Swiss-Prot record:
Chain sites annotated for binding Zn(2+) 2: C796, C799, H822, H830
Membrane topology (UniProt): Peripheral membrane protein
Name of the molecule in the record: Ubiquitin carboxyl-terminal hydrolase CYLD
Residue ranges, compositional bias (Polar residues): 337-346
Catalytic activity: Thiol-dependent hydrolysis of ester, thioester, amide, peptide and isopeptide bonds formed by the C-terminal Gly of ubiquitin (a 76-residue protein attached to proteins as an intracellular targeting signal)
Organism: Bos taurus (Bovine)
Main location: cytoplasm
Amino acid sequence: MSSGLWSQEKVTSPYWEERIFYLLLQECSVTDKQTQKLLKVPKGSIGQNIQDRSVGLSRIPSAKGKKNQIGLKILEQPHAVLFVDEKDVVEINEKFTELLLAITNCEERFSLFKNRNRLSKGLQIDVGCPVKVQLRSGEEKFPGVVRFRGPLLAERTVSGIFFGVELLEEGRGQGFTDGVYQGKQLFQCDEDCGVFVALDKLELIEDDDTGLESDYAGPVDTMQVELPPLEINSRVSLKLGETIESGTVIFCDVLPGKESLGYFVGVDMDNPIGNWDGRFDGVQLCSFASVESTILLHINDIIPESVTQERRPPKLAFMSRGVGDKGSFSHNKPKATGSTSDPGTRNRSELFYTLNGSSVDSQPQSKSKNSWYIDEVAEDPAKSLTEIPPDFGHASPPLQPPSMNSLSSENRFHSLPFSLTKMPNTNGSISHSPLSLSVQSVMGELNNAPVQESPPLAVSSGNSHGLEVGSLAEVKENPPFYGVIRWIGQPPGLNEVLAGLELEDECAGCTDGTFRGTRYFTCALKKALFVKLKSCRPDSRFASLQPVSNQIERCNSLAFGGYLSEVVEENTPPKMEKEGFEIMIGKKKGIQGHYNSCYLDSTLFCLFAFSSVLDTVLLRPKEKNDVEYYSETQELLRTEIVNPLRIYGYVCATKIMKLRKILEKVEAASGFTSEEKDPEEFLNILFHHILRVEPLLKIRSAGQKVQDCYFYQIFMEKNEKVGVPTIQQLLECSFINSNLKFAEAPSCLIIQMPRFGKDFKLFKKIFPSLELNITDLLEDTPRQCRICGGLAMYECRECYDDPDISAGKIKQFCKTCNAQVHLHPKRLNHKYNPVSLPKDLPDWDWRHGCIPCQKMELFAVLCIETSHYVAFVKYGKDDSAWLFFDSMADRDGGQNGFNIPQVTPCPEVGEYLKMSLDDLHSLDSRRIQGCARRLLCDAYMCMYQSPTMSLYK
């Protein structure tokens, strides 16, 4: 978007003589001429039109000589004036402007703007109107009554309209005001029973909700464009020799490079006549041309059938090139029921698979008026659409649904006239959209074998758009196809997952639910379309109507009936080696993820799947100072999460949701049931606030008091000389630079990697040391001299980076070696300190070289990539005994489906951990095989345990 921006001290009056407002349709990047700073004006921002450009401003030439620019003063940025192309804005009236300005999030504002019906209803909401209020995202709406409507602060020329609502019934006490805003009483209600909200948080309660049709969020540009002389889907005839042949128009437009010749028409013939493949001069003009039955002729050679009615563009439908209102043509034989889609040139597509039968029936068939059938299931996205009155829109009243033997015996059905854009012909039928056998080359010859009634096993997982069986779907063609998904699966011989859609309207070339001779579902003839699942999108017309289930309340034993896990009362140590491997490995193993729970799933799996170092947390009896829900939390962790995980290798998401709800009881916590969190947040709330776990780490800094904590975050500056650091190096360097020591040897050491947030990593790869020697990091512990191996008496932090003496290692020396080392001229000014030793250190220990080492073993690594946490755990002694866990590895169903956790072996990790640091540094991360790349490149926390402090040893 081309634009210019100025800073103005004061906007003079000629700008505001006429109040015309525009909303930006895309983001604009502009430069402030005074500060030279780049500012972003987001999509959804609102500006007031500048009528007089001569006052204090100079016109900025448009890029590449573009004209028709509009000058705007952005209302949210009072000193910002910019010029934008006309195509990048849409005019809105002042009343809409006031409603939208109250929504501070421009993205949400733009979303509401597209929902014209809801925006229009906002004008009707006034004092006394009953409404529902959305207080928090994802939660239920509370009933209320509007007590105030207007601006909260009338400081600007145009102010946003807010609504003061008194909450009723279950909403009482959930608000935040008694009607006072910034000391001014705008309405009166009880304390905490009122809220001030913008329109996006309100829903008008109506006795009769008949506004479904206009809830379709159409485009902002509704300008009419010239239509071609013949309408797509219209019936035509042509004379071939002595006979008249009929067909359906599938293309009508000028040819590229031959515009002067006028319109050409592509006709899908009723009989196998023609040889046009949809191309002209190598350009694909039509995706539905069949070389067996399609012909391309000049429009003068085409005989249109009688005109039955004047066609108008569908309300709020997207208009494409070649769309208009020249009139439609119909054939005298009965037409198939279907929707009047926007005609126009179809883009090339490989979405559609050939079905069976000819593209147009050879025998005329009487068609019933269209009905749509939707499974009545608890969480069907279309559930709210099933009570639409029969006279909705332009569709004819629905007939009785077909006999139940043609439908699934497992469901009950509702009849629903579905299409928002159907326009009936004079005979009551609906014009249809042909789908010819245009892609036989994709599928090969059709199988004409008898229909099989036992299709291959359906694939239950949806796609990235949350689509599943029962979802309202749209196939983005020109015009689009709309329907409901009846089947998802992978037919034999295909590598693609297909979706079987029952279209809302009949379409030439479609079936009654069969594909390649196999029946996958049952529907009316010419309504079954099979497409690639990835080519489907949620039906955009009903984006604002599809209810989003409350994922918190949905996570219960009823909804998750097929995924429930056991309760185990008996205390269970972790199973190791082969036994543990066999229990834990496979799909539907580990902890099931649900609704942003991966941070919690992976952390719990790391801590308890194959380690007992923290099992004391599960066993400590309740004390008088514990929170009231201490026992509930501990029992839940022990019997419903840890023990079942160790015995059966699986924990259901409902158990984790119980824990998440408990976490939210803590005053310092919020969002644990729904938001993305970090493992350290979870550990702090669980260990410190609820279970009051004894701090895992006791650390002292330079003789100060001991500090307690549960994990240690490594802070350090990046050393360019270090390619791939080890955890040993990082921990020692961090301790030396901060002058820290462990006051006690920890039984469990959780180390957070040096990174900032979820994205920025200090090192591209980190080597997770399998063994951590913390001897030199402990207070009151005998340590070896770095030179002779004797008992160290002094430590010198300044010698740490000295390349001449074991570079990158902590330097402690005996009395003799310390004197020798510091005789060197470059070390003369070093300040070394005495090593603190235990008072009762046996004299013979160090003299006989028996200075003990304190070592810890790596037992788990928590990793993060693109905000998703996964876990690596070690289940045995062997170097290759590694497992990889992902709580959301697979998906069963769409938005209201279920995540399938998975635990997989990853023995390749052991091979990479045997490599030298130099080899790892030179290794391209993209060439690291299997899961090992995530372990080496995405480590977030490394967890170590003392081999001598396990509870069950």
